[in-house]
Amino acid sequence: EVAPYGTTAASSAWTNLGAGIVNSFKHVPTKYSVQAGNAPDPIEGVSTEVAQITGELIEYDATVLSTINGGLISATATSSVSTVVAGGNNIITPMAFRITNKRIVSGTTKYTTLTVFKATLDGGPEITFKSDNDADPIAVMPFAITAKLDTSLTAGSQLYTITRDL
């Protein structure tokens, strides 16, 4: 799901992106180490940190692509056709992304939900079209998302949350 930057988890502003596959999630802190000439031990910390998500959309249309691209592309849709239009936009608006994994445990549905608060796609749409006769004819759309700190949130909880039903 995707929503405008600043959207709370309980908001109804989330847009379903359709079926997809998440390939990876990674929290990437950039560490630093500084040692003064007269100090016995170095001081270590984190200078920057991002979260990265990669995956593939299986179901997508022009409206979904426009929404997740944060203004890089735009879309129109009618009852019979959807159209993506791109080129010339130079501002990408960060979005909030929420990825939900559903699993069945002993007959009970359990969810794991990953939410990043301020993120953008790393590139525009990419599709490798396949033949109808391909063993797997579904043309997926790969994506990569990079989330940055949302400094409007409390320190320590500015990048992402992961909740998992037990």
Can you describe what each PLM-predicted range is?
Residues 4, 16-18, 35, 68-69, ...:
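Intrinsically disordered, low-complexity segments enriched in small/polar residues
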Residues 59, 87-97, 132-141, 153:
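Low-complexity, flexible helical/coil segments
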Residues 111-166:
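Mixed-charge, glycine-accented linear interaction segment located at domain edges/termini
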